[in-house]
Amino acid sequence: MAEKDIDKLLSMTDSKYRLSVVTAKRALQLRSGAPSVLPVEQRVRTRNLVTQAMRELATGKLTVGTSLLDEQRFHQDYVRQRQAQIQAQLNAERERERD
């Protein structure tokens, strides 16, 4: 990322430490399957999820917070989505077996 982008990110937080923690947490969310907030054409064409997380933060579409409740809510939503996907796959397999 360009230095001006990093300066913008630093202005969104109260410290370099908080920026690094928030970026790392977002990268972990992306690795866990969280959808990107960036439009497809702006997504990073790299496996470096830290860079993608920083670009997402730079857009302003994500807010920097420390709320544990937000993290828990994200995790619960992710688990629900994953369970729904698995259930849909199981239902599709059952339908194929019936045919």
Swiss-Prot record:
Its EC number is 2.7.7.6. Keywords: DNA-directed RNA polymerase, Nucleotidyltransferase, Transcription, Transferase. It catalyses: RNA(n) + a ribonucleoside 5'-triphosphate = RNA(n+1) + diphosphate. Disulfide bonds: none annotated. One of its GO terms (cellular component) is DNA-directed RNA polymerase complex. Signal peptide: none annotated. Belongs to the RNA polymerase subunit omega family. HAMAP family: RNApol_bact_RpoZ. This is DNA-directed RNA polymerase subunit omega. It comes from Deinococcus deserti (strain DSM 17065 / CIP 109153 / LMG 22923 / VCD115).
